[in-house]
From Swiss-Prot:
<protein>
    <recommendedName>
        <fullName>Putative uncharacterized protein YDL247W-A</fullName>
    </recommendedName>
</protein>
């Protein structure tokens, strides 16, 4: 699992859904 902070730094909120889809 990755930290929420890291997720926000890696990608903007707009792409958050896309990023989550890639992981899952």
């Amino acid at each position: 699992m990755h930290s929420n902070n890291s997720r926000q730094i890696l990608i903007p909120h707009q792409n958050e859904n896309m990023f989550l889809t890639e992981l899952y």
